[in-house]
Amino acid sequence: MITFREIHKALAVTILALFGATSCTSRGPAQSPVRGATMQENLNPQGFLQHWLILEPISVMGLTDSAVQAAVKREYFPNQFTLIPRDGDKVTIDDSESTWHAVNTDDYNVNLYYFAHDLGKPTSNVLFWAVTIVDCPQEMAGARLAIGSNAASVWWVNGQEVIGIYNDRQTVIDDGVSKRLTLKQGLNVVRCAVINSPGVSDICARFLDAEHKPVKGFTVNLGDVAR
């Protein structure tokens, strides 16, 4: 028997999905990649991470759990799970150079489709790597990474895999939420791999506290950090 609570939950998920799809498809072209920039910005009021280093897309196939895990666990370039790139850094993948770009957005999400399109790169059946640095003035225990993506994605914090969502999906705010973790004092590395099938692709991410409210009080630092 379907309960009112189940109907209410399903309706809420549907509304959020429609909101995410509309936000992705209705706005104009995304901002051009920022090059050679050192950025250290306060969070927006909802706590979304808006400043990222994104690698030009890599061709892959598959959105199921096993296909995504196989794709993200393959080594495309040295130290891909520990590398802290700078804007303009290059890596070699299958004998071709790919470049990291510093990108920022005024929205809650980062549009990966426009990122790739503006660079003249493939937008479908591709893998995006993205990295950002969360700079905490003090240790923050009990935080949870809350993410959304179109389509599948896997996320790491300080080298530990913390959340993954799979299959073809629209971006929904807080679609996947990690277990509680501790953000250490100083620099914390947030890394994600996103696989897109044909169509729009984007991500959103923020940290939530025990009351499901955005964690604030830190900055996002894409500056000249140590490797």
Language model: regions and residue ranges:
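Bacterial N-terminal signal peptides that target proteins for export
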Residues: 2-11
